[in-house]
Amino acid sequence: MTRDKKHYICSNCANISHKWSGQCFDCGVWGSIVEEIISTNKSIITGSKQTFDKLSCDVSEPLRISTPISELNRVLGGGLVLGSAILIGGEPGIGKSTLLLQLTASNFESKMRCLYITGEESLDQIKLRAIRLNITNYNTAILAATNLEDIIASIDDNNNNIDLVVIDSIQTITTKELSSPPGTVSQIRTCANELVNYSKQNNIIILLSCHVTKDGQIAGPKILEHLVDTVLYFEGDHNNHFRILRSYKNRFGSIGEIGVFEMSSSGILEVTNHSELFLMKREHNVVGTSIFAGVEGSRPLLMEVQALIVPSNMLTPKRSAVGWDANRLSMILAVLSSRIGLNLANYEIYLSIAGGLKITDPASDLAVAASLISAATSIPLPEHSVFFGEISLSGEIRKTAKAETRIKEAVKLGFNKVICSKLENLTYDFICSCTHLQDLKEIIK
């Protein structure tokens, strides 16, 4: 009897080593090395010749199936594509299972036949949640299983009746080919690879729910994200009632698209007036508060930027940013000090994006700078105004992409003053162009 060999693999970068260590020598992550058993019973398999195709051959657009959830359709690029594999991650309790159960129980126009497979709950728990969510589509099939071979055999037995399969979650699925426990790198990689191949061979849509680490990254090997066609993150704060579904990879659409949802006692609801969700209605502007006209994917979104500046006796005053890059905040402070003489070295500075949103758009620089200047001078910003524009190290305001989209969203919500970089081919009376931070300072005065 041959003895199986073993090696050690990093759960973060999949680097292989022959002995255990506390830290991965390749990516430097601590505590990520796990043991993996290698089966030695391998036979030599020869390949067969494959026919080549030409890049210039005609190909039709992928058939998209629109879901009853319009926000999900937007994130996916128009709907579900047959034969695609979709990965959706998020923190525990954020609403992944609820969203997927509502999707499978939805009334598709194309009469999709859906199967919901759970490896974390019992069938009675799924039924109780369906009752709580007032789901009345009892034609949705449900299955409690964790073995890969059993799952594929069950789908094969009803191959003509299943169009969409949800697996919650991929970390609970195991294969008989491996002796390692569920959730290990080898189990996740092997099971995900088999499921993705199966979906493409049988033209079935597969949605895989997955856990995330404490850093917010998808748990398991990075290859998991490479295997699937689409990677979605369900973001949000447990203290807030809204959720953001964001696409980080999409072979059939654009990345960066977001869908806005609201958690309620009856499940997850779509939000149509998404900008109003993140804005507080006030009669007058508050010192240190500005409105940023942003774009997430193709969706315009207005967000509130708040800044607070207080004197400090500390040798190194605190700099805190919630929902924004702290390094970029330091850069903006340095530019304000160097270019317009706003010295905040002896002050504690707190910056927050209201509603728990996270902004990575460089065009938010101008809104942040406006909030900081307003907080430092105790002068409220102009009424009903929005800001967008990227700030360079020289203090100049750079051009911004999708400016017209941002302006139209601001006008739609009742804002009558747009403070931004200099625009070409756009001449509106309510646009106040800035070419330098000095211009912004004059506007606030």
From Swiss-Prot:
Keyword rRNA processing appears in the UniProt entry:
no
Does this UniProt record's set of keywords contain ATP-binding? yes
Residue sites binding ATP per the record:
90-97
Q: Name one Pfam family in it.
A: Zn_ribbon_LapB
What would be one Gene Ontology cellular-component term for the protein? cytosol
Q: What EC number(s) does this enzyme carry?
A: 3.6.4.-
**Zinc finger, C4-type: residue spans?**
10-27
May I ask which residue range the UniProt record assigns to the signal sequence?
none
The motif RadA KNRFG motif: which residues? 249-253
**Which of UniProt's keywords are assigned here?**
ATP-binding, DNA damage, DNA repair, DNA-binding, Hydrolase, Metal-binding, Nucleotide-binding, Stress response, Zinc, Zinc-finger
**Which is one GO molecular function term here?**
ATP-dependent DNA damage sensor activity
Name its GO BP terms in alphabetical order.
Answer: recombinational repair
> So which domain of life are we looking at?
Bacteria
Region annotation Lon-protease-like: residue ranges?
348-445
SMART domains named among the record's database cross-references: AAA (SM00382)
InterPro entries, A to Z: AAA+_ATPase, DNA_repair_RadA, KaiC-like_dom, P-loop_NTPase, RecA_ATP-bd, Ribosomal_Su5_D2-typ_SF, Ribsml_uS5_D2-typ_fold_subgr, Rubredoxin_2
- PANTHER family attached here? DNA REPAIR PROTEIN RADA, DNA REPAIR PROTEIN RADA-LIKE PROTEIN
Domain comment quoted from the record: Has a putative N-terminal zinc-finger, a middle region with homology to RecA with ATPase motifs including the RadA KNRFG motif, while the C-terminus is homologous to Lon protease.
Described by its record, this protein's role is as follows: DNA-dependent ATPase involved in processing of recombination intermediates, plays a role in repairing DNA breaks. Stimulates the branch migration of RecA-mediated strand transfer reactions, allowing the 3' invading strand to extend heteroduplex DNA faster. Binds ssDNA in the presence of ADP but not other nucleotides, has ATPase activity that is stimulated by ssDNA and various branched DNA structures, but inhibited by SSB. Does not have RecA's homology-searching function.
Query: Would you identify the family this protein belongs to, as annotated?
Result: Belongs to the RecA family. RadA subfamily.
Q: What is this protein called?
A: DNA repair protein RadA
Which organism is this protein's natural source? Rickettsia typhi (strain ATCC VR-144 / Wilmington)
Write the gene name. radA
